[in-house]
From Swiss-Prot:
Keyword Chaperone: no
One protein family per Pfam: Peptidase_M20
Name of the protein in its database record: Acetylornithine deacetylase
Source organism: Escherichia coli O45:K1 (strain S88 / ExPEC)
Family: Belongs to the peptidase M20A family. ArgE subfamily.
Subcellular location: Cytoplasm
Catalysis performed (reactions): N(2)-acetyl-L-ornithine + H2O = L-ornithine + acetate
Cofactors, names only: Zn(2+); Co(2+); glutathione
Chain's role: Catalyzes the hydrolysis of the amide bond of N(2)-acetylated L-amino acids. Cleaves the acetyl group from N-acetyl-L-ornithine to form L-ornithine, an intermediate in L-arginine biosynthesis pathway, and a branchpoint in the synthesis of polyamines.
Binding site for Zn(2+) 2: 112, 145, 355
Name of the coding gene: argE
Amino acid sequence: MKNKLPPFIEIYRALIATPSISATEEALDQSNADLITLLADWFKDLGFNVEVQPVPGTRNKFNMLASCGQGAGGLLLAGHTDTVPFDDGRWTRDPFTLTEHDGKLYGLGTADMKGFFAFILDALRDVDVTKLAKPLYILATADEETSMAGARYFAETTALRPDCAIIGEPTSLQPVRAHKGHISNAIRIQGQSGHSSDPARGVNAIELMHDAIGHILQLRDNLKERYHYDAFTVPYPTLNLGHIHGGDASNRICACCELHMDIRPLPGMTLNELNGLLNDALAPVSERWPGRLTVDELHPPIPGYECPPNHQLVEVVEKLLGAKTEVVNYCTEAPFIQTLCPTLVLGPGSINQAHQPDEYLETRFIKPTRELITQVIHHFCWH
């Protein structure tokens, strides 16, 4: 029953008070089960059917799909339930206590992005879901901040094909229709150790890596020359060498050297294409030194994403907001949801507050966000 739903600020408070940290380090990683239970109960109270989906390969993580209405198409509103870890020494407030001060709501996940679910629930108070002409879906995912396992698994397994989707990441209510992807690899070279007084008796992994880096930097130049997307502030794929380590003593021939690098591909560039380009770039080293060079993923890759600029979703949202869609450099779950239907990234709060101590969402977003959610539900589910 709708009258069982708590007030907006109490929903928000309960979401923030329920820890759901995602981390690659097991000691910091937390299940999102309690948060999923909260959301599931509230959407059931609103008359939605709720499905909770365990996500394989995670530490007790779940997706939730709440659905209402019959037929094909409809609207999907999506977001992730997890947050990043927090640095206790840098927060001046309790991260798990929603605190309002000077026009800001403070707490871990206020902007990125538990708050979006509070806005959805609050907007649905005034929607008679029994009269929907098309279905409305609410998706809450797991592990966006690490592997994006929840969105990946949902996209791989669902039969849903909504007309369109909105992911409520903090975009300051500016609609986003494209972003770059992210690929992070470890280049590892296995040499042969020996005493530095006789270099011919060993294979110096640092020297081989020096050769490999030269080819990687040539790839960086080729990416810049070959691929362009003028809407981005950096209108080409970037390649960064971020970390390198090799050897353990000045008088030993280095046996192992490891380089960590990332590529930020443009929308439309496939992961297979990028892997092929990297392997081709490193082929001269691999051919000269068989079996000594390997390339491994550091994290699951995220492809670039783009919603067709002429899609009805873009036209409707631009008209409602009086703002043109944008492109951004950070990554979201949009590439995976986009495999199901045209998708925009659009939500309250600023990305500048995400992953920061004393994270907050400005209260000025409350009214326009509620209005926007109501409007898109009416447009895509009532007509």
